[in-house]
Design a protein with these regions (language model features):
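An acidic/histidine-cluster motif and surrounding catalytic segment
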Residues: 1-95, 99-222
């Protein structure tokens, strides 16, 4: 499966992580290549969308412009990959620089979005405080339970959130649905926008990617 590893060009650690991620994908059937990420400095080169009303991104816009522009840059990377998925007319994987491939892709069948790192995602320090984490079954399953849900008062409210966007696969159908929602309602923080109201979310175990490197936390600026 064509796999795009997001990194920031010129950021030494980001480039090192990206190279390690691609190396981990060797002989895995994840056909990985670098994908230069958008930054606040290059954001104006891409189509601009308004943020959804009463959402997470709107809070950042009023409270911290730097974080807002960084979050918007991160989201734009997803949009570019979704468009690439439709252009290629085949499933692709979105993988962040600090992810590591741990097993071979075996052409799992999924509908729209498949979380590729479900077990390690919930073990991230950011979720240490989260209670009632989901019990995960072997194989591909619908993402029907999560303690992470959308709390803001808009059309996404009460949907289940993807537990970060470290590694996921998406089909052209899933990409089209997310882009349609974007055009209609606007954008939000990436792991708030990819939710169960917007797209059919599924997970797979054993997972294909995990975290072995320290999180650079680049979604909050760098």
């Amino acid at each position: 499966m064509k796999t795009f590893v997001i990194y920031v060009k010129g950021h030494k650690k980001s480039e090192q992580y990206m190279n390690k991620c691609i190396e981990s994908c060797s002989n895995s059937n994840f056909d990985a290549e670098p994908f230069e990420g958008v930054t606040p400095a290059t954001l104006n080169e891409y189509t601009q969308y308004p943020e959804i009303k009463n959402g997470r991104a709107e809070c950042f816009k009023s409270e911290n412009k730097k974080i807002y522009e960084t979050k918007k840059s991160c989201f734009t990377n997803h949009v570019r990959i979704w468009k690439k998925c439709i252009e290629l007319n085949q499933p692709v994987a979105f993988v962040e620089q600090d992810s590591s491939c741990i097993r071979q892709w075996n052409n799992q069948i999924f509908n729209e979005v498949l979380i590729l790192n479900i077990s390690s995602a919930f073990k991230q320090p950011v979720f240490d405080h989260v209670m009632n984490k989901p019990n995960l079954d072997l194989g591909v399953h619908n993402y029907n339970y999560s303690p992470l849900f959308y709390r803001f008062n808009n059309i996404f409210q009460n949907s289940l959130l993807i537990p970060g966007t470290g590694a996921y696969a998406i089909t052209p159908l899933g990409a089209k649905k997310l882009l349609n929602i974007l055009e209609k309602h606007g954008w939000d923080q990436s792991d708030f926008f990819i939710n169960t109201k917007n797209v059919n979310l599924q997970y797979v175990t054993p997972e294909y990617f995990t975290f072995k490197l320290k999180n650079l936390n680049m979604s909050y600026g760098f």
